[in-house]
Structure formats: structure tokens, C-alpha cells
Amino acid sequence: MPRLFSIGKGERKMFRWGEHLETLGNGVSVLVNETHHFGTDTILLADFCLPVKGKQAVELGAGCGAISMIWLREQPPAHITAVEIQEEAVDLLRRTVKYNEKEELVTVLREDLRQLQGKLPMGAMDLVACNPPYKTVGAGLVNAEEGKRIARHEVACTIEDVCLSAAGLLKYGGSLFLCHRVERMCDVIEAMREAGLEPKRMRLVQQRAEKPAKLFLLEGKKGGRPGLVIEPVLLIEDETGAYSGEMKRIYGSYRNEQE
């Protein structure tokens, strides 16, 4: 059993070695460790989903639950269900929810996202978000550590699994929000359409204006009519190499808390 320790005088909870709190701002924090943490893509996806206030929301493959916590920081949905298959990540997420005193707003479910029938109400959700593994099995080196392997490669679920799961959960007109690598764009669009989700809104993400896009954000609507809108490119940095104005807005109080 890992040793427990207090993270500071007056803190209400106890955490394990190797874990720390990322303070997102507005009184919301998320517990992370070396395996289960989050990056810029997660923050961009959480913002791309907004507004979520008053909605029934699901985060598939939630990991440490950063998307769910960012939603709570910005504009709380009516309820969030965070689905995650890995025991260690689920334990982290449950303690994060408890630390933030959000048990009434967030349900953490340890389940395989491919087997949610009977575990969650089908056709009842307003939105589903997922930051899926980007690499197919056989593409690149597979990490020996299980947690990192599941996060990076499609060993526990494929993009087709994610889209089918979301389609089952969503009500008619509900949306699935994804982020993915540009080289997988055709796979993602095809998987959405095969699941009955019509791609409606896309945004490319570039590090700087002169750099090629490596990431894209995509919204697919259940039962939506064909017609995809490509939004302006999201630039991470401006011409000086500093965060762009939009990135400063998206990071918001989170970045200020880290500095």
C-alpha cells in the first residue's frame, strides 16, 4: 500500500506519493500523477465543448478527469458522468471529486466504454467528450507501462468504439466532441458517420501561424444534417512565441495559478 501524506497544512484530504494537485482556478483542482495527467489538448477540448451549463454530460476515457473539472470551473453541467476503465485513474478521479466537494454533480464510473448498455441511460445525454488514444496498434513504440499504453494506443478502445459508445448515449441532436491528430482525420470522420454522428464543426490547432496543424477539434451531432463548418485556426503562440490571446483566454485562471 503506498504511503499517504498531507499536501499542506489545513488541506482536507490525504494523497499518495507521486501525486499532486493542479489548481485549475475558481476553486477547482485536479489530482494527477506521472501516469494520469493532462496536457494542452485536454484543455482545448474542454473549452471547445462550451457552453455546457445545465446539460447532461459524459466524459469517456476520463483519465484524471481534467475535462470534467474544467467544465465545473467554467459553467457546471446539470450532471457529469466520468467513465474510466483503469483502476488507478478511477481512484484518482474519485478523490478529486471528493476533494472539490462535487459528489452531487459528478458520478465516476469504472467501466469499459464499449459496455455501457445497462450502466447508463441510453439516448439521454446532451453531450459526450473524449480525448481518445491517438495511435493505432502497431503505430510507433508501445509503452511498457499499462496506463500510458492505454492512453496513447488503441489497445482498450478504438475511435470506432468511442463513436459508437457516444452515439448510444446521446439524445437526438446531442453532440460528441473529440480532439485528435490531423493524420487520423479521415478515420475519425468515417467513424463518426458510421455511428450516425454527423461532423458539424471543426477547428484546426497550430503551434504558430507558419507551422502545419497537428491537432484538430471536432463536433459530431447525432442525427445532424450534412454540413461541416471549419472555424478559424486556433493558434497556440503568437509571432513572438508567447501564448496567443485566445490561449490566454482558454487557460484563464489555470495559467495564472501556475505562475
What are these regions (language model features)?
Residues 15-56, 62-64, 69-74, 219:
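SAM-dependent Rossmann-like transferase core, predominantly class I methyltransferases
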Residues 29, 79, 105-107, 198-201:
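Conserved beta-strand segments of alpha/beta enzyme cores
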Residues 47-141, 164:
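Conserved SAM/SAH cofactor-binding pocket of Class I
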Residues 212-259:
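SAM/dcSAM-binding transferase cores
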Residues 132-161:
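Mobile active-site "lid"/loop adjacent to the S-adenosyl-L-methionine
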Residues 38, 156-207, 211-213:
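Conserved Class I SAM-dependent methyltransferase catalytic core
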Residues 2-17:
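N-terminal auxiliary segments of SAM/dcSAM-dependent transferases
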